[in-house]
UniProtKB/Swiss-Prot annotation:
This is Aspartate--tRNA(Asp/Asn) ligase. L-aspartate binds at residues 175, 221, 454, 495. Aspartyl-tRNA synthetase with relaxed tRNA specificity since it is able to aspartylate not only its cognate tRNA(Asp) but also tRNA(Asn). Reaction proceeds in two steps: L-aspartate is first activated by ATP to form Asp-AMP and then transferred to the acceptor end of tRNA(Asp/Asn). It is found in: Cytoplasm.
Length: 596
């Protein structure tokens, strides 16, 4: 028999009754039932119930074992009585009668429990992550993550992609976040950067003639953490294709990702035909470029119904500024004053003056609008709004007015809030879509200049001619995002492979041809030697897994994440370098300047 096990803790079945077997694992739980000890032994695969009765030679040692000790047990497989069968466990029809126990490793008193809900402080969980990872939910999440990545690799191979790896030590490039820098010992005073994404390398692969590339790529960005983004590093399914239009990318990746979602969705419906929603439409309908399409609320402009109306706050705004619009946020079943007042109070908590509303109710046979706005604009306008939005008895509508560029985010948050409060969102489904036609440039209020809105390597719609003749803020890009349930899960574009167009685009944000050659020399040179039209995308693996398992944050699907302060509490990173290390790197630490 093997030194440690003949079976795993999930392997034994009724067909094994009468067999003498050996299993090893962690003591999950010990129970004393009238002098008979029951030990639940756990390993990576599952749990087996072990019985140690007082007549067993293993009983004396069994009395000493404690939770999370690692032990080996030899014993006889017996069938459980009918009234003790546990149908929720694969091994629930049998139990193992212990004949011999060996303690392989004792455990100290645990700083946190390893079963049940993780109600301990996060820093404790991260410091003892090796214990936290023994929890069933987290353990299964990590296994699911690995399975998702394996599925991605398999599916990508099936549609003709080949996996290539790109360098980790590279040059710094402006991808929209701070770089993690690595000092060079051989070249004092210079630094490598960890890649924020393999963007330039994958484009160079297309120039080199590799037709369809993909990679499970680690990416490093020195940015503040949030629920849907881990500090430090994250992983993406990175891909690039030659001789393609954006439709080719969409038609390749949407069915592929739908298949992956269906494989792990546990029966939940998944979008098969992804809608393609222009960025401007998404902003106006949903108040977001990553809309949750499970929420049925669709916003509409109702400016005309308030222009010249008796509600002077809106009417005066409309009359004094042509940019002003009034957007309606229809809320079916929201027609109670209590709900409307809660929404108004929430808006005030967000720094808004309030949230105007109308709700409709039947008075006898007549459907009437109620609330201060209805009184001010009158019955005819109120009914016109209701008709436009398709509302009825028991429904409500909220209104936001001003310059849409300034209020659309709040309007989108109000849409989400109303959908949540009214329980309109079907959470047991995956709604996927493409957001397309992103603006190529945006105005940076901080720097008072035009800047790239997203990926600077995207192809502008209209090409060089658009850059030469159009207002840059009106130019769209061949850029697209994939969105699932309100989360951006991918971003991609058709790339700009023309050196002239590349320089013209960067000139719009204040960079000269010399700057382009200095910062992106490899890519700029490559484009002068025959570059195919190409495009691609990058799907965020961490976010996709988070959605599939229903985790609340990314730390619940990552092996060894950092905390919110970008510290690895288990390994003690970041750490202080030794004087010798600093001398070798020609680095002298300078204390940060204290702010008053």
């Amino acid at each position: 028999m093997h030194r440690y096990r003949s079976h795993t803790c999930a392997a034994l079945r009724k067909s094994d009754v009468g067999s003498t077997v050996r299993i090893s694992g962690w003591v999950h739980r010990v129970r004393d039932h009238g002098g008979v000890l029951f030990i639940d032994l756990r390993d990576h695969y599952g749990i087996t119930q072990v019985v140690a009765d007082p007549d067993s030679p293993a009983f004396k040692l069994a009395e000493t074992v404690r939770g999370e000790w690692v032990i080996r047990i030899d014993g006889l497989v017996k069938a459980r009585t009918e009234d003790t069968v546990n149908k929720t466990m694969p091994t629930g029809e049998i139990e193992l009668y212990a004949q011999e126990i060996e303690v392989l490793s004792a455990a100290k008193e645990l700083p946190l429990p390893i079963f049940g809900e993780p109600d301990y402080p996060e820093d404790v969980r991260l410091k003892y992550r090796f214990l936290d990872l023994r929890r069933d939910t987290l353990h299964k999440n990590i296994v699911k993550r690995t399975q998702v990545i394996s599925s991605m690799r398999r599916h990508m191979g099936e549609v003709g992609f080949t996996e290539y790896t790109t360098p980790i030590l590279t040059a710094s490039s402006p991808e929209g976040a701070r770089d993690f820098l690595v000092p060079s010992r051989i070249h004092p005073g210079t630094f490598y950067a960890l890649p924020q994404a393999p963007q330039q390398y994958k484009q160079l692969l297309m120039v080199a003639g590799f037709d369809r590339y993909f990679q499970i790529a680690p990416c490093f960005r020195d940015e503040d953490p949030r629920a849907d983004r881990l500090p430090g590093e994250f992983y993406q399914l990175d891909l690039e294709m030659s001789f393609v239009t954006q439709e080719d990318v969409w038609n390749t990746m949407a069915p592929l990702m739908t298949s992956i979602f269906e494989e792990f969705a546990e029966g939940k419906p998944v979008t098969k035909e992804w809608p393609r929603i222009p960025y401007d439409v998404a902003i106006r309908k949903y108040g977001s470029d990553k809309p949750d399409l499970r929420n049925p609320i669709v916003m509409e402009a109702v400016t005309e119904h308030f222009a010249g109306s008796g509600f002077k706050v809106f009417a005066n705004m409309i009359a004094s500024n042509p940019k002003v619009e009034v957007w309606a946020i229809p809320a079916k079943t929201g027609g109670s004053r209590a709900f409307c007042d809660r929404m108004n109070a929430w808006a005030q908590s967000q720094g808004q003056p309030g949230l105007g509303y109308i709700f409709w109710r039947k008075e006898g046979e007549k459907l009437e609008g109620a609330g201060p706005l209805a009184k001010n604009i009158g019955e005819e306008r109120t009914d016109a709004i209701r008709t436009q939005l398709g509302l009825d008895d028991g429904d409500a509508c909220f209104f936001v007015a001003g310059d849409p560029a300034k209020f659309y985010k709040f309007a989108g948050e109000a849409r989400t809030r109303a959908g949540d409060e009214l329980n309109l969102i079907d959470r047991d489904r995956f709604e996927l879509c493409w957001i397309v036609d992103f603006p190529f440039f945006e105005w940076s209020e901080e720097e008072k200049k035009v800047d790239f809105a997203h990926n600077p390597f995207s192809m502008p719609q209209g090409g060089l001619e658009a850059l030469q003749n159009q207002d840059p803020l009106t130019i769209k890009a061949y850029q697209y995002d994939a969105v699932c349930n309100g989360f951006e899960i991918a971003s991609g574009s058709i790339r700009n492979q023309s050196p002239e167009t590349m320089v013209a685009a960067f000139e719009k944000v204040g960079l000269s041809q010399a700057d382009v050659e200095e910062r992106f020399g490899g890519l700029y040179r490559a484009f002068q030697y025959g570059a195919p039209p190409h495009g691609g995308a990058a799907f965020g693996i961490d976010r996709i897994v988070m959605l599939l398992v229903g985790a609340k944050n990314l730390r619940e699907i990552s092996l060894f994440p950092m905390n919110q302060q970008a510290q690895d509490l288990l390994m003690g990173a970041p750490s202080v370098a030794t004087p010798t290390q600093l001398r070798e790197l020609a680095i002298r630490p300078v204390p940060p300047v204290k702010k008053d």
